[in-house]
């Protein structure tokens, strides 16, 4: 990387990191060279420099070294052009055509100019072509094709690509692009249309500017369509699309024109000619800008005052009233995050509800992106459900965040049990009052980064008035009035401060401190009044109350009460203020003061009388806005309270409570060591000899012998054979033995290589392992002697190795791990997982590191530039430094001791860490690794914090990338029992419960029964496996596209693992490691089949998805049957013999008749005589489906629903008509005209488009999922018809071809249908299928228009598959079938792709491409960790582990690719390469939006009141603005400080509580206390989104469970008949227990009993309990019939309310009715009261949205409640006692809807 982007300090920092890296690598290489490990060298390579990256990413081969030489000699700009020269001169090989030279030169040069950043040369440029100026002189010119995602490359890179393109054009001797007026006007239109219809451009050029650029840019800026928005300038010559070309628009507008000034610098530096026009453009623009500014200023001076006065005259609404109105009209509450609430994870605030989280703009020093900082007091008052690092689901700006502390934002305002109201702004106060809180009136501030609004493109909400806004208004007023320049958040010039203080009559020291730290230093209330009076600025926000929470009429009432209050007055600087206010304790007045957020207390003055006491300074805060009661407050229409105050009072107010945000708890924080399941200490196989605990020591003590699959090595010197790499006898490096699985012969590596790894005796592929006998006692004794470790309790190995080579770890490493109490991961490393938390600044005392040590590490000055001297100074974190949790420190200390022991006792080298305490690890290096990533990144430990998160720079977290597939990748899944091929984007949408985890969105909860098909390499079969979660992550800068033989292809991220077949086995490679010629599997697919005779249309249309049509679908032909069952229906239905489906379904329900009992009938639509028979025979239906997929389409209008088929041959049309009649009967018409057959029927239309989901047109048609599970005979019917329509049999060669514009349809047919017959095909593609249409071309030539281009795919069947096709399927027509006779006798060519497991096809071409979308997708397949995508290609998925850290030397010494599982996770989540130097430009672009300023300026707050888009606000500097400059690494500022980054709860209460019932009880208790939460809504949502789905899901799991052996853990689909494990004789047990199913039932029933939930929800719980009871009553002996106790009789109550009598026989509390030998109910018990006995059922209908309940102080169990009632006596006494309790209703305050009343 070039030196110019670092400061000297950062350069020294990176050099110091590299020195430590080199030191660690040198030690590891020395150790590895001894030959005791699988490889002689370290297996974790370092990432290359810029030149290396350029070569590996864009090529050409061999260019890296030349780039280094040229950059050193000329600098990167000239070097880029020199490389272009050399590429075009052929110095890097013959590339073929001019286009190839041009493309290579452009990409390589641009990669150099952008420092090897991937996004510009690869993501931005889709193609490079040489075209002709056909509309001019026919000369050749260069065209660059840009893609939509070019935006992420940045404007400078976009502009540079054009410049480089022009240079390449000149070198190739091409003419310039000569656009016609059509070209120019087309681009003018596109720029404007894109800005209006798609997204706002950062720079929207004027039409003339676009024309200027188009006429002068020497190359064509074009691209493929990115948006389906049509232009009016259509069919322009040379432009391939009539839609918007987003990439080209961005390059022209935001690249060339916006960055014109910067482009001029490059033009001059690189000496490129012909660009004088852009220099003139820049000069003209600068002149125009300055003259415009002068014009605006003079205009403002002349007319400004008049316009303001004119505006005032026209005002009819108050300012804040209008703002609220505008706010409500433009920004609606977002309820999405409340759709699901997990039991035990509270809702903290309803959407946009007053009293929830108050939005505060800013960034704390422990914030970066997707982070909220809140006051630690808020965490404590919310029952510690929020701890540092807890994840939350949020209303806006993004979907999720983690929580960090900030003590300089406001905490909660609470009412205590004694009636006092307290502002809890500090942790100490929170600790004192936490147990006394009665109601949380205001939750507190949520500090949200402006960059999060930019990233999520969320409209800015009006800012609430805060201290950082007020201090800027103070500074501005001092400047305007006294002409004294001061700066907020800074140490100001002392003289200037003293001058201002003298004018203001305040203490200079106070003013100096106030300006330096306005968030902590606050004026007393009298000074605040004085400053507002003197400077005419709003009242200080600390003393401003939530006035707009009240209605004007309520403030009127409050003022009247204050007029009768006892008030103690005082005076300061001639301003009167209240010192104390004593009010009568009126219920309404008390509530008004609470809603104002006014601290006060209740004081007893007489025996029963209490008064409200408001002390200083809050007495003044209350009365000052009311003018000290000197003017009368009167409510005014269309005015808020603050509007009225500002109209009448001399001291004005700003609203401190406009914008509120809702949130709920997500996942708790995490920090713990990574262990395999079960934990492992050495990767050494022991089989069953070690017992269930896999204890090698135990096996050795018992003298057992183990038979395991393991790699053995043979000493070439003395012949010793064993699992060791180094001979224990003579110390020679051994050779790997390759084993013949047939004859059992072993061959050393050198011999096996000569034999090409095939047995010379039997020609079988050799394996690097075999099942061998090992003696644990001998091996363990030898290992103990080697490292002198003896007294161990156990040594846990693995049952078997899952790696490809099955090489075992040295046992010595395991012994040393046991000694140090650490555990190994699957790749040989030791890891610690932690939740990511961002931090940009820290104090030495917060991380436990001394000032002296930090100076050694390069921290010489604090963030303000002062020398580091104290441990409380704030330092800016360097980008690759990390602060680990104490838990990590303690564990890594053990790891360091293990590494030292390993070096000393195993390798015989000096100890490295010598760490006695965890502070000794400071300065040492770690590798950070995130889930779905390939490359780790080097980090340096600088300290530890007492939290459960890993603090690191936002850049560091963003540098850990993910690997996934594009969203349009198709994947083979099973949905509700039917196989389907859907896109990954569609799969993601089939899951819910989205969480934001470590920069990726994760969903784990399926909406349907979804499984994925995987390939099992051991059995060679395709099997179903569960999906653990699906992932959506921001796309990387570019993707790799693999084109395989036979027309197959797929795309993935660069580091994604790919499964390839090599040396007789399946191995994983990173995508960038895959080479042309590597073989990838297309597996044999054998899906389970079931025979179906007919399709029941009545049953299909009775499904819920057609409920909206049930009144209109008519069932005909069942009148007699309806009479026979005495159905209660209208006589008219019987007379006409036509009944609505809705009525029939009601009859079936009432009569308890199943739909199968309804006799054969016909279906039609109301007022339509067309009828279709109910039972559709499958064979003719499939014939029609085949014709439909080939030649059919569906059409609908307001009154017409048709299926049409276009067929040329009469024989085929007759076959279709015959099939239609056989399938659907004679109740409809078939219309034939020319070669077209049409059927008019809405039933048939819905059958094909909605039931079968066969699509509507050529582009959307798909094979119905039902067909995939049918037997071959049935499928042949469909295929015969399909190939008759879309297929042809060629006469010239033995080949069948099917043509379609729909690739997905062809893939369905080939991969899932033809595969049933053992038939495979290959794909070809015609980019212009119309080229042979001479008449069509002539038509367009005559009119001067461009002929349309039709892209057509072809599925080809040849070779032996050709013969199979005709023998098993064939065509319908004799004409096509007869062609087979021409080739029947020809012997087919041998299938060279066939293998035992399927087809092995080679990689034909690899190319880097630009992603089409902003996100990529993946999933975690539970067992096999691979998936089947696109044309049946097997490839790996992503892994889903937590972010982890490991000591660098541990990874270098112990990581080996030979340990990585061949399946089950493979190479994912392993440090295959490590990035040594972080480049902010290359990390995830989300962090580029993080702001880096000390405070947000006044212009920003004004913009929020205008509800502007964040992208319109240019006054806040972000990381993006610094990219490519030294400042991108350092000088980052923050807006809000915190006293301590570790202040706050360390562990969420959620993790500390026990069972779900306890968690939900605490969750609801908190909901009852929070004013901004409706606890009844919470209860309802928990039941519907968590408890019921879990109950039902567990119930389903029980019926589908496997059985497990307790001894060897083998699982069986069905229990063995012997009742014992066939393998080891162990006991067989269930994998899903009864308790697991019932565990949430008590919680659910408690919720429906205590909280007002809908009847439907109660019914769901009743039905679920009944289902559980029914399942188990015959399976288990009934010891306890009901779990719920006294809260259980919900269903009994509902039955009684509806029928007037109790159905005790089927009730759920039979035991309480005296049945089954249980205790009988007492009439006065609480259970009786709940069931409704002893009183009339309520007639009042419960509303869908119940009113809020009275406050419930505690959640007591119902059993306890019943006992208390019995102790008090009767239920009547209990009721009376309850009624005497004081009742207080919660009040939400004022939401946006309530603000305006009804």
Swiss-Prot record:
Catalytic activity: DNA(n) + a 2'-deoxyribonucleoside 5'-triphosphate = DNA(n+1) + diphosphate; Exonucleolytic cleavage in the 3'- to 5'-direction to yield nucleoside 5'-phosphates
Keywords: Autocatalytic cleavage, DNA replication, DNA-binding, DNA-directed DNA polymerase, Endonuclease, Exonuclease, Hydrolase, Intron homing, Multifunctional enzyme, Nuclease, Nucleotidyltransferase, Protein splicing, Transferase
Biased composition (Basic and acidic residues): 1733-1753
InterPro entries per the UniProt record, alphabetical: Hint_dom_C, Hint_dom_N, Hint_dom_sf, Homing_endonucl, INTEIN, Intein_C, Intein_endonuc_central, Intein_N
The record's account of how the chain is modified after translation: This protein undergoes a protein self splicing that involves a post-translational excision of the intervening region (intein) followed by peptide ligation.
PROSITE patterns: INTEIN_C_TER (PS50818), INTEIN_ENDONUCLEASE (PS50819), INTEIN_N_TER (PS50817)
Compositionally biased intervals (Low complexity): 1714-1731
UniProt cross-references to SUPFAM superfamilies, sorted A to Z: Hedgehog/intein (Hint) domain (SSF51294), Homing endonucleases (SSF55608)
Enzyme Commission identifier(s): 2.7.7.7, 3.1.11.1
Pfam families to which the protein is assigned, alphabetical: Intein_splicing (PF14890), LAGLIDADG_3 (PF14528), PolC_DP2_cat (PF24846), PolC_DP2_central (PF24844), PolC_DP2_N (PF03833)
Keyword Transferase among UniProt keywords: yes
Family recorded in the similarity comment: Belongs to the archaeal DNA polymerase II family.
Subunit structure: Heterodimer of a large subunit and a small subunit.
UniProt-listed PANTHER family: DNA POLYMERASE II LARGE SUBUNIT
Protein name per its UniProtKB record: DNA polymerase II large subunit
Native organism: Thermococcus kodakarensis (strain ATCC BAA-918 / JCM 12380 / KOD1)
